[in-house]
Design a protein with these regions (language model features):
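A structural "domain/chain start" motif
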Residues: 2-3, 18-60
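Bacterial N-terminal signal peptides
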Residues: 8-18
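Sec/Tat-exported extracytoplasmic proteins
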Residues: 55, 59, 107-111, 131, ...
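Short acidic low-complexity segments
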Residues: 61-72
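Surface-exposed short loop/turn segments
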Residues: 75-120, 124-142
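C-terminal/domain-edge helix-coil "capping" segments
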Residues: 135-160
Length: 160
């Protein structure tokens, strides 16, 4: 008698979750309302590479190489990355750094009309530093910048 009760309870919970529109973060289709899109960034820019991956994976929009052929053009207005000292130890050596990424973008159509007003995204990560582990901390910093780029592109795609 316990097995059918558990099964029934599981089915009720699953129906309630599905009924409220819950989706796992990675399973959303991410459909953009634009059929074609131009990304006004150099081909080697990290943000462009990550955006192309997300948009191509969603399959709802096509990335074009000419702004005249695009329904929407992504324009970067600001890309500021800073590494500042957060704290020092008693000997005056750095203990922590703060990594800051400030990014502003907008989306315009072929006529130059603004489709998405300028949006500012600010991301911050703190990293500890140790003189005896310089190489490891350098790798950790690189991973944090990469993680911040990933978060940045996720937020950009959601705002488009």
């Amino acid at each position: 008698m316990r097995v059918p009760l558990r099964l029934l309870l599981t089915l009720i919970i699953a129906a309630a979750i599905a009924g409220c529109g819950f989706q796992l973060r990675g399973t959303k289709s991410g459909n953009l309302p634009y059929k074609t899109m131009y990304i006004a960034l150099p081909e080697t820019a990290d943000v462009r590479i990550w955006m192309e991956r997300y948009i191509n994976a969603a399959g709802s929009s096509e990335i074009v190489d000419d702004a005249k052929l695009a329904d929407a053009t992504f324009q970067q207005l600001l890309d500021s990355r800073q590494k500042t000292i957060l704290s020092v130890n008693a000997q005056g050596r750095v203990r922590e750094y703060r990594l800051q990424l400030n990014y502003t973008f907008r989306l315009v159509n072929q006529k130059g009309q603004v489709l998405v007003a300028p949006n500012e995204i600010s991301l911050t990560r703190d990293i500890t530093f140790d003189d005896s582990n310089v190489l490891a901390k350098d790798l950790e910093e690189g991973l944090l910048w990469r993680d911040m780029n990933n978060d940045l592109v996720n937020q950009i795609i959601r705002r488009l």
